[in-house]
């Protein structure tokens, strides 16, 4: 490029220098701004003490709610299982009385009664050893009567030998009888004391004896 004079050349060079200076300055400034922004984004913001307390309370509430939910679920399942067990006991109790009242028992009925007798004897054997010899003798007597009833039922009989058996109505002791009867004569550890008290009644499960048992008539 040719210049007419030195003055025009100087002016042109000065203009070019200003342009380059402006361009370079702007680029440097934009880079520094972007770096400062990236640094500010990378640094985590400090959490205030109030926010920390709120977070802790929320965590505690969540844990408490989970524990309450688990506790409610456990109690609900426990109630359901208890209801199902009571219904099962009642159903077996009805089945036992229905079979026992039959004059002509089928082979399946006899097998069911025989199974009850065996289970009751096994349950009596599982009771802890009793120091009272009198109660021990009564338990042995019950076992013998259970075996005799088993033989008598197997021959088609409907009642124990040696006397007439009368049926009592299920009044106040109905719930107790159903609770103690499980259809297979299993005796829970919580009822052992009651079994000892009622052990003088012959028949199947001692808890059932008051329903069907009555002293011989003097007639």
From Swiss-Prot:
Residues 34-44, 69-79 have a biased composition (Basic residues). Disulfide bonds: none annotated. Residues 27-79, 186-219 are annotated as: Disordered. It is found in: Nucleus, Nucleolus. Keywords: Nucleus, Transcription, Transcription regulation. One of its GO terms (cellular component) is nucleolus. Its main location: nucleus. Pfam families: RRT14. InterPro entries: Rrt14. Involved in ribosome biogenesis, probably through modulation of rDNA transcription. Belongs to the RRT14 family. This is Regulator of rDNA transcription 14.
């Amino acid at each position: 490029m040719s210049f007419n004079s030195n003055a025009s050349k100087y002016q042109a060079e000065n203009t070019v220098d200003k342009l380059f200076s402006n361009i370079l300055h702007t680029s440097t400034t934009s880079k520094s701004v972007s770096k400062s922004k990236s640094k500010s984004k990378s640094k985590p913001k400090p959490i205030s003490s109030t926010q920390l307390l709120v977070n802790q309370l929320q965590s505690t509430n969540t844990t408490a709610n989970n524990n309450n939910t688990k506790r409610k679920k456990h109690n609900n399942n426990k109630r359901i299982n208890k209801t199902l067990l009571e219904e099962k006991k009642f159903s077996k109790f009805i089945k036992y009385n229905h079979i026992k009242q039959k004059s002509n028992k089928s082979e399946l009925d006899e097998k069911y009664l025989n199974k009850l007798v065996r289970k009751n004897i096994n349950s009596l054997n599982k009771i802890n050893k009793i120091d009272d010899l009198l109660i021990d003798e009564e338990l042995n007597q019950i076992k013998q009567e259970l075996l005799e009833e088993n033989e008598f039922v197997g021959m088609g009989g409907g009642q124990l030998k040696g006397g007439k058996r009368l049926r009592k109505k299920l009044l106040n002791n109905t719930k107790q009888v159903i609770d103690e009867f499980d259809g297979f004569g299993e005796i829970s550890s919580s009822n052992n004391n009651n079994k000892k008290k009622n052990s003088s009644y012959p028949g199947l499960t001692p808890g059932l004896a008051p329903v069907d048992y009555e002293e011989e008539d003097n007639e």
